[in-house]
């Protein structure tokens, strides 16, 4: 075989891998990872640490497909915005690496399969919650709130809170107050997390015409809102401690103090006219949420007396 004959198959393989990675990127794997961090502890707390491997696996698979479907449909709806924002210009649809109709078909297929998967493998409530989450994320947040109000991530962030509800309902078949407390934690955590990133890329949002709070408000106004929601986040984590042992409560208290310190430092820096470093808060907010929910998972499987 000559050199040209050997190179051709490599090119075909390379294109196929590139296409596969483009489809994978549509699902936003990093976002799905964060959802798993919250869903697993929710399932463990729902049954106080009793582990049901098959049920948990089916819930995670169904939840991942729902999240992947929602993220893919989000990419379809946001393709026009992504093309003009530097941060998102390399997304598959923005650079036309994937046909829009294929992305739409993928998103819808994943959504439908996730509903039936959760319904058949867990219960109808979990399946319905997943379906409602996808619809809310795509139609209410992406197509409506995101482009119309600076409070878009406050209300639209409810979609990101649903994995804990789905995980809890898959185990118990109901929704109880600890699930609502976990929902509140993520609901209040989302604005500081998102706005910190948006502060760094506010010019992108301004160019795209997306009224994200940092794009339409002063840095002082934004950091004040970040501070308020950070306090609400920490308060919600402490409320959840009523359903756990002292281990989770202690971690939530210490981690909350750390998270609040960063938020206060950002606000104080803006008031003092110092250079803004919002990405630090954005990155550490991920670590904060992971620490809190990992502590919840450990607390749920260790036989310790609860606080209530």
Curated annotation (Swiss-Prot):
Instruction: Tell me the superkingdom of the source.
Output: Bacteria
State where the protein is found: Cell membrane
Query: What name has this protein been given in UniProt?
Result: Protoheme IX farnesyltransferase
Identify the species of origin. Mycobacterium tuberculosis (strain ATCC 25618 / H37Rv)
What family is it from? Belongs to the UbiA prenyltransferase family. Protoheme IX farnesyltransferase subfamily.
Free-text function comment from the UniProt entry: Converts heme B (protoheme IX) to heme O by substitution of the vinyl group on carbon 2 of heme B porphyrin ring with a hydroxyethyl farnesyl side group.
Q: Which gene encodes it?
A: ctaB
An additional note in the Swiss-Prot or TrEMBL entry is: Carbon 2 of the heme B porphyrin ring is defined according to the Fischer nomenclature.
Q: Which HAMAP family match?
A: CyoE_CtaB
Q: In which pathway does it act?
A: Porphyrin-containing compound metabolism; heme O biosynthesis; heme O from protoheme: step 1/1
PANTHER family to which the protein is assigned, alphabetical: 4-HYDROXYBENZOATE SOLANESYLTRANSFERASE, PROTOHEME IX FARNESYLTRANSFERASE, MITOCHONDRIAL
Catalytic activity reported: heme b + (2E,6E)-farnesyl diphosphate + H2O = Fe(II)-heme o + diphosphate
Keyword Transmembrane applies: yes
């Amino acid at each position: 075989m000559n050199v040209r004959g050997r190179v051709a198959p490599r090119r075909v393989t390379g294109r196929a891998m590139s296409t596969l990675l483009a489809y994978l990127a549509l699902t936003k794997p990093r976002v799905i990872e964060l959802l798993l961090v919250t869903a697993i502890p929710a399932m463990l707390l729902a049954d106080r640490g009793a582990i049901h491997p098959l049920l948990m696996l089916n819930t995670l698979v169904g939840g991942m497909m729902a999240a992947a479907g929602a993220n893919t449909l989000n990419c379809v709806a946001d393709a026009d915005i992504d093309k003009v924002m530097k941060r998102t210009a390399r997304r598959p649809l923005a650079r036309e690496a994937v046909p829009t109709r294929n992305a739409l078909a993928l998103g819808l297929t994943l959504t439908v399969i996730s509903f039936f998967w959760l319904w058949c493998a867990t219960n109808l409530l979990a399946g319905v919650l997943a379906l409602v989450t996808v619809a809310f994320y795509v139609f209410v947040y992406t197509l409506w709130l995101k482009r119309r109000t600076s409070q878009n991530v406050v209300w639209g962030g409810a979609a990101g809170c649903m994995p804990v509800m789905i995980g809890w309902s898959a185990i118990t078949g109901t929704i109880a107050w600890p699930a609502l407390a976990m929902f509140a934690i993520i609901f209040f955590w989302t604005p500081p997390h998102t706005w910190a990133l948006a502060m760094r890329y506010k010019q992108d949002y301004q160019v795209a015409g997306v009224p994200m709070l940092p794009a339409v408000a002063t840095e002082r106004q934004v950091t004040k809102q970040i501070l308020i929601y950070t306090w609400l986040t920490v308060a919600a984590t402490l409320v959840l401690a009523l359903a756990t042992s002292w281990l989770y409560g202690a971690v939530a208290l210490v981690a909350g103090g750390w998270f609040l310190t960063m938020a206060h430092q950002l606000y104080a820096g803006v008031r003092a006219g110092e250079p803004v470093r919002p990405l630090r808060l954005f990155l550490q907010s991920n670590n904060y949420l992971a620490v809190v929910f990992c502590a919840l998972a450990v607390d749920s499987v260790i036989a310790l007396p609860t606080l209530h």
